[in-house]
Amino acid sequence: MTSESTSPPVVPPLHSPKSPVWPTFPFHREGSRVWERGGVPPRDLPSPLPTKRTRTYSATARASAGPVFKGVCKQFSRSQGHGFITPENGSEDIFVHVSDIEGEYVPVEGDEVTYKMCPIPPKNQKFQAVEVVLTQLAPHTPHETWSGQVVGS
Protein backbone atom coordinates (compact mmCIF):
# COMPACT_ATOMS: atom_id res chain seq x y z
CA MET A 1 0.00 0.00 0.00
CA THR A 2 1.09 3.49 -0.73
CA SER A 3 0.53 6.41 1.56
CA GLU A 4 -0.69 9.07 -0.88
CA SER A 5 -2.51 12.18 0.24
CA THR A 6 -6.22 12.25 -0.61
CA SER A 7 -6.41 16.05 -0.78
CA PRO A 8 -6.29 17.72 -4.21
CA PRO A 9 -3.05 19.41 -5.28
CA VAL A 10 -2.72 23.10 -4.43
CA VAL A 11 -2.94 25.22 -7.57
CA PRO A 12 -1.93 28.89 -7.36
CA PRO A 13 -4.50 31.48 -8.52
CA LEU A 14 -4.35 32.58 -12.14
CA HIS A 15 -3.15 36.12 -12.81
CA SER A 16 -3.91 38.17 -15.90
CA PRO A 17 -2.62 41.76 -16.09
CA LYS A 18 -5.23 42.52 -18.78
CA SER A 19 -8.25 41.47 -16.74
CA PRO A 20 -10.49 44.45 -15.79
CA VAL A 21 -12.16 42.50 -13.00
CA TRP A 22 -11.16 42.47 -9.35
CA PRO A 23 -13.52 40.18 -7.49
CA THR A 24 -14.17 40.99 -3.88
CA PHE A 25 -15.46 38.98 -0.94
CA PRO A 26 -17.26 36.54 -1.09
CA PHE A 27 -16.08 35.81 -4.63
CA HIS A 28 -12.34 36.10 -4.04
CA ARG A 29 -11.06 33.51 -1.62
CA GLU A 30 -7.52 32.42 -1.01
CA GLY A 31 -6.69 29.56 -3.33
CA SER A 32 -9.60 30.24 -5.68
CA ARG A 33 -8.95 30.07 -9.40
CA VAL A 34 -10.02 33.56 -10.43
CA TRP A 35 -8.30 35.94 -12.76
CA GLU A 36 -7.25 39.06 -10.99
CA ARG A 37 -5.60 42.32 -11.83
CA GLY A 38 -2.55 43.44 -9.94
CA GLY A 39 -2.80 46.62 -7.91
CA VAL A 40 -5.73 48.28 -6.20
CA PRO A 41 -9.28 47.24 -7.16
CA PRO A 42 -11.40 49.91 -8.89
CA ARG A 43 -13.70 51.78 -6.52
CA ASP A 44 -15.84 53.89 -8.85
CA LEU A 45 -17.68 51.20 -10.75
CA PRO A 46 -20.84 52.33 -12.55
CA SER A 47 -24.05 51.34 -10.87
CA PRO A 48 -26.23 48.70 -12.48
CA LEU A 49 -29.24 49.62 -14.57
CA PRO A 50 -32.09 50.90 -12.44
CA THR A 51 -34.82 48.40 -11.70
CA LYS A 52 -37.99 48.48 -9.69
CA ARG A 53 -37.31 48.87 -6.02
CA THR A 54 -38.32 46.14 -3.65
CA ARG A 55 -40.69 47.44 -1.02
CA THR A 56 -42.47 45.56 1.68
CA TYR A 57 -45.96 44.41 0.82
CA SER A 58 -47.47 46.78 3.38
CA ALA A 59 -45.68 49.83 1.95
CA THR A 60 -46.72 48.90 -1.59
CA ALA A 61 -50.31 48.22 -0.53
CA ARG A 62 -50.55 51.55 1.33
CA ALA A 63 -49.19 53.48 -1.66
CA SER A 64 -51.45 51.69 -4.14
CA ALA A 65 -54.51 52.28 -1.98
CA GLY A 66 -53.73 55.98 -1.59
CA PRO A 67 -55.14 58.88 -3.59
CA VAL A 68 -53.80 59.96 -6.98
CA PHE A 69 -52.17 63.40 -7.10
CA LYS A 70 -51.37 65.66 -10.05
CA GLY A 71 -48.23 67.66 -10.61
CA VAL A 72 -45.60 68.86 -13.06
CA CYS A 73 -42.09 67.53 -13.50
CA LYS A 74 -39.78 70.20 -12.11
CA GLN A 75 -36.52 68.42 -12.91
CA PHE A 76 -35.37 64.90 -13.73
CA SER A 77 -31.84 63.58 -14.28
CA ARG A 78 -31.68 60.27 -16.08
CA SER A 79 -27.97 59.92 -15.28
CA GLN A 80 -28.59 60.42 -11.55
CA GLY A 81 -31.80 58.39 -11.61
CA HIS A 82 -34.05 60.83 -9.80
CA GLY A 83 -35.85 64.15 -9.96
CA PHE A 84 -38.62 66.24 -8.44
CA ILE A 85 -42.30 66.88 -9.06
CA THR A 86 -44.05 70.13 -8.17
CA PRO A 87 -47.48 69.20 -6.80
CA GLU A 88 -50.55 70.84 -8.37
CA ASN A 89 -51.61 72.14 -4.94
CA GLY A 90 -48.35 74.12 -4.58
CA SER A 91 -46.94 72.17 -1.64
CA GLU A 92 -43.28 71.17 -1.24
CA ASP A 93 -41.63 69.41 -4.21
CA ILE A 94 -41.80 65.62 -4.13
CA PHE A 95 -38.81 63.34 -4.79
CA VAL A 96 -39.19 60.76 -7.58
CA HIS A 97 -36.87 57.81 -8.27
CA VAL A 98 -36.35 56.41 -11.76
CA SER A 99 -37.71 53.03 -10.68
CA ASP A 100 -41.11 54.56 -9.86
CA ILE A 101 -41.80 55.98 -13.34
CA GLU A 102 -44.29 54.11 -15.50
CA GLY A 103 -44.39 54.33 -19.29
CA GLU A 104 -41.89 54.64 -22.11
CA TYR A 105 -40.66 58.24 -21.83
CA VAL A 106 -38.03 59.85 -19.62
CA PRO A 107 -39.69 62.81 -17.85
CA VAL A 108 -38.55 66.33 -18.69
CA GLU A 109 -39.30 69.70 -17.14
CA GLY A 110 -42.90 70.68 -17.77
CA ASP A 111 -44.39 67.20 -18.25
CA GLU A 112 -47.71 66.79 -16.46
CA VAL A 113 -47.84 63.71 -14.24
CA THR A 114 -50.06 61.79 -11.88
CA TYR A 115 -48.59 59.96 -8.90
CA LYS A 116 -49.24 58.39 -5.55
CA MET A 117 -47.18 59.01 -2.44
CA CYS A 118 -45.16 56.68 -0.23
CA PRO A 119 -43.25 57.59 2.96
CA ILE A 120 -39.46 57.57 2.73
CA PRO A 121 -37.87 55.25 5.32
CA PRO A 122 -36.46 55.09 7.93
CA LYS A 123 -38.25 57.97 9.68
CA ASN A 124 -41.22 58.13 7.27
CA GLN A 125 -41.40 61.91 7.76
CA LYS A 126 -41.03 62.82 4.07
CA PHE A 127 -42.71 61.37 1.01
CA GLN A 128 -41.71 60.35 -2.47
CA ALA A 129 -43.77 59.94 -5.62
CA VAL A 130 -44.54 56.39 -6.74
CA GLU A 131 -46.55 54.97 -9.64
CA VAL A 132 -45.68 58.11 -11.64
CA VAL A 133 -47.45 58.35 -15.00
CA LEU A 134 -46.74 61.04 -17.60
CA THR A 135 -50.20 62.30 -18.63
CA GLN A 136 -49.20 65.20 -20.89
CA LEU A 137 -45.76 65.64 -22.45
CA ALA A 138 -44.36 69.18 -22.35
CA PRO A 139 -45.10 70.83 -25.72
CA HIS A 140 -42.30 71.71 -28.15
CA THR A 141 -39.81 69.66 -26.13
CA PRO A 142 -37.93 66.62 -27.39
CA HIS A 143 -38.53 63.51 -25.32
CA GLU A 144 -36.35 60.45 -25.01
CA THR A 145 -37.60 56.91 -24.59
CA TRP A 146 -35.96 54.64 -22.03
CA SER A 147 -34.34 52.80 -24.94
CA GLY A 148 -32.65 56.04 -26.05
CA GLN A 149 -34.76 57.07 -29.06
CA VAL A 150 -35.46 60.82 -29.25
CA VAL A 151 -39.03 61.74 -30.20
CA GLY A 152 -40.38 65.21 -31.06
CA SER A 153 -38.60 68.46 -31.69
UniProtKB/Swiss-Prot annotation:
Record PANTHER family: CALCIUM-REGULATED HEAT STABLE PROTEIN CRHSP-24-RELATED (PTHR12962), COLD SHOCK DOMAIN-CONTAINING PROTEIN C2 (PTHR12962:SF4)
Comp. bias (Basic and acidic residues): 27-36
GO CC annotation terms, alphabetical: cytoplasm; nucleus
Phosphoserine sites (modified residues): 19
Native source organism of the sequence: Homo sapiens
Any single biological process term in GO: regulation of mRNA stability
Main localization (coarse): nucleus
Location in or out of the cell: Nucleus; Cytoplasm
Alphabetized UniProt keyword annotations: Cytoplasm, mRNA processing, Nucleus, Phosphoprotein, RNA-binding
InterPro entries: Ca-reg_mRNA-binding_domain (IPR052069), CSD (IPR011129), CSD_CS (IPR019844), CSP_DNA-bd (IPR002059), NA-bd_OB-fold (IPR012340)
Signal sequence, renumbered to the chain: none
Transmembrane feature ranges: none
Start and end residues of each CSD domain: 68-135
SUPFAM superfamilies: Nucleic acid-binding proteins (SSF50249)
Described function: RNA-binding factor which binds specifically to the very 3'-UTR ends of both histone H1 and H3.3 mRNAs, encompassing the polyadenylation signal. Might play a central role in the negative regulation of histone variant synthesis in the developing brain.
The protein, known as: Cold shock domain-containing protein C2
Region listing for Disordered, in residue ranges: 1-62
GO-annotated molecular function: mRNA 3'-UTR binding; RNA binding
Record gene name: CSDC2
